[in-house]
């Protein structure tokens, strides 16, 4: 018997959470005024509540105006109101609750109660019953709750207004009960106080054992099925069950019984309202379209057990309770279905903690009989009251009554993912409505199609079943829906739009979604709500939409290639689908037809043989067998097979394949369809009554038949002699001898050597012999023989006579058709013939006409195509046709491929044109010609519901490791795995990037102008020394500057000063990856050493000069050209010249080291425009950029950084004087770049910047410049110390040329750069590594003042010497305990839970990829165990049965000698026995003795009856073979008869036969007859003899 687990109902769906009953504790006691509770019980209950409110409800009109303090519904005649349509059923109430006015818009609820609905209160037995017909009172109301100023309901209510307002209402923040203060007098205003209290939890959760004695296995379902079929054969002999797949309305008349604990718990006053509310929810569940049938749950009777009922035992044991309840409810159910309180199913609601199988608490909540509907003794279930989930328990158990099994048990409807079903064993939290699975739909449909719901066809006395639907989103707002999905801390994501299509919830700061739409009724705007995925204006409640049938599907493939297969077509109730309580479709949902009816070849196996052979490759009990079919007459549509050379059979399939013949052999055409044997007529129509006449003409009248009769007269013969030929197609064959003789009939084929009967002088037994396509019945009684066969024969056969004696003559006859010798009519009568041409396929333009071939019967016309051979069917003919020209229309081309294969941005396009058909061509027209038509969409979204595969996820950049001088910053780059696929390593973003490239401040930096600098790029030969020309490497020689060119890796764009830093930062943040477009991009894992590791060649270093003038004294006329081309003058060698040296100078702005602006990264050759905010520092500065240039062609990738020193002081001359700029620069100053690119052997480029603070005007100190002896070469710098080293310097000649080109104003005005003055500043070291490899750690660095005294740097904010770091969580594997081994021997397995956890926070779980970096493989999830081979169980003989009848037990000892036996295969130690009832022989009274004297006999009745009280059904099953049957006859009146004084009668005067005839006609009373037949008609006994017989009877009676 199926049962429901407690966890199945632990989670609720919003579809039916309209009403809840129970209680919920929280809050404080608040009441507006002191109130006294006259009723002690109510006072005790209310005072125990943690919070309650006193309110005074008033009845108002639709506008909120007070009508009356009286709350009772004014309507008194329920029948009148129902007939009137309920125009006055609308009621409005108002209460003030929690400082808010709540308005109740309620309607009288007539929907699920019959007109004859009765409430019974029983007090122990039938003699103490109070019955109340409650359906006439319009007390029960249902509707919505509104707040003041709103038009959309915020909740629902189910109230009773019979005596005040009693019931329940639901608000978004909680559930509340309301009831009047009992026995309280009216207030001064005439109002009546009510108490409102919050729903409390009924009891604390209990830990229950996960044991549920569920018995919905295959064996149990087969057993229940057999019992059901046996009951139907015995009980429903006269009823013809409808077995068509037609959807009809069904009404389940329901009895609900509440036990004493339920009544006590809810109270006699509230229990009815509670139960009716629950049943209302059950009705809604069965109105779900997913059930595929139109089923109404109608309550006809409610029984409230005020005291323990006699004959009904409700205990903890579920099966015992169910057995007792089923027997009790049958006894109180009126047998007549016309009785208004007759019920089809009974539902028990109990507060007992029931458990299936064991007498202790467990998680069982319900129990039912499988497939028990419409069986009076089995249509019942019990349910444990658990509050609101009770509705789901009852619906679940009623499903079992309809034959629905648990999802996932013996079917493939195991709940997948998050979505559960009503018949699931367990249900999780889910905001979507609970539905019935496709398996549940198939189970109940099959149950009803088999006619097993015959008792549900009668319509109860009702006035309509329209459902009052409330959209669930009206009750549960988006926050509540999120809490149902993700727990109590979840909220709605306000940032996400279009909530009607997808509900997004905020969980721990992240927006998450299950990609489900918000529930219907959810608010989506001002006076708008969601309905069917769209945001529409709020109006009235949505009208119910009744379902409509969709189009029939195409016919399926034929199940057979020959021999009459089956095809099916079905339609769905989706045009439209029933919504908002609309009725499900009624009518035929699936139809079948036969196909390929031509016979199969005789040498092919039967269809059942083919199905059995499918199991030849399937092991059965660890062995393989060859199976062949076994026919079961009781179940012709189930597949039973038996192995060859074995003596057992097994049911392989519950239903054979459609089209399998119900009966093999014979003339029956009946086939199995959907497991049911269907009648098939000779026209091969299902459920057809068409029959053949005598000669096999379907629906013929016999006019085409002729009967051939012949007589074989040959008297003598030897051996086998031919009698005559029975032709092919002969029917009604009869052969018989005229008189008995010793001869034998025989049958042979046209082959003289092939005999079918009595051949080879061997005489066969009487019986049926299958030959020539029919069955011949051979019958021999004595020496008289005959043969009978119905035909038709599929070949001609010869009748023969084996002579033994003289032949008295043999008659034989058969019936054939008149129209030819060949009786194979199908080949002669049916043929293909083309029909008419169809209409043109189009109404305009060029179309096609078609001509199809139809199967035609000779002389009758078109018939079904199954009568003709499909292999010879001609192809359809077609020809073109042209109608008038078509008007303009929109044409849509094929959709292009989606722009993305996954993710939320996919779109696909197509071409949409306005065209017109011109003959056979299409002409494009302007779109205005089609503007009157709806234009198809040219752009739609696609693939947005598909998750993208794995991709890289980057974290935030860390702080730079240094504040200046060049450092590194890092970020995490992880693979966010989707679908367990790896990420593309070629697209992995960088995890490291350069930063802090601005030069650290230093002192003693002087410059000397050089007049020989040629900005034009030409090499100017001069006798003066040029200290700015670098000394090339010994292996290279100087090369004249060439025409200015810009390499591809370098950008010619000039960034503005005030946007440099912001551009870099924004681009990196937007892309999630820095340096991505940089030609010097660093690959992951690159290192940045402080010096080059190359020793083969010293790289040539070039320095670039950056000058920042006073931003407040910049003359626009002195700046020169403002275009990018003018600001950049770059000279470089072609990349293909490996030995050339190119010098590039760069003039860039400089910023004070004391600025608070963010750090700026300058990327050499970046290709990205970068902006940096302009610093307001008054000082002018020069920045030296040291640029390493590759020597050969090599990838522009950076894996090493070279620290750069300042320009060498030894080559600096006097400090020039810079005139102040007279005009403030509006905007930003571009950078001047002269870059020297020199090849390097390491193939990489490194760039560093050093900043030189410029002294203020007036502080200039002249100095002499030193000349170089060598005008062509300079010593290469060999150190990176800021205070020493070598490098190029700016000479006076260089400065003069810069002035000439507009770069500098006057060479004499920059001598102030030579001032040896620099303020103190902080010197910071490089950041250390993180102090920890995981978890929270710290970076450290040294911070000291450049002067050596920290006090000198107090005016400058000291950089942080330390900062936090968190590389990754400290992850580790946490393993659970191993489970018990699945087998105790022969190899099992055990499993455990393995989780990636935070090793510091043991309660925090991490994603598995955090643990993939741990050493070693992850801990295994499973391992093998108990590998020892299993031993054999040793069993002892069975003991004697413990009882001789009434169900006993046999026991035996079972042991395992070695202790290693498979416990799953342990033989049973007990077995039931002697289940038959305990019965005995009961004897009746002896009848009168048949004679008065001389020895007569008398009899009595003897019956085998049960020894205990039982029903008539039990009496039919009684067997008394264990007792000796008492005698049924005994002798009597043994005394001799006293002779009469009359003359002795020796014999009858008339003949004995005639006297016996008269006696049988009861004529012995006639004196003349008695005189003539004195012996046959003896004289009547005398008075004395009669008295003696009476005394004898009295004595016999006393003996009994």
Swiss-Prot record:
Cellular component GO terms, alphabetical: extracellular region
Propeptide: 26-244
Disulfide bonds: 326-380, 355-362, 374-455, 413-439, 482-505, 493-511, 500-530, 524-535, 558-595, 562-600, 573-585
E.C. designation(s): 3.4.24.-
Activity regulation, short description: Inhibited by alpha-2 macroglobulin.
Spacer 1 as annotated region, ranges: 705-831
Cofactor note (record): Binds 1 zinc ion per subunit.
Motif (Cysteine switch): 210-217
Cellular compartments annotated: Secreted, Extracellular space, Extracellular matrix
Swiss-Prot/TrEMBL domain comment: The C-terminal four TSP1-like repeats are necessary and sufficient for binding COMP.
UniProt protein name: A disintegrin and metalloproteinase with thrombospondin motifs 12
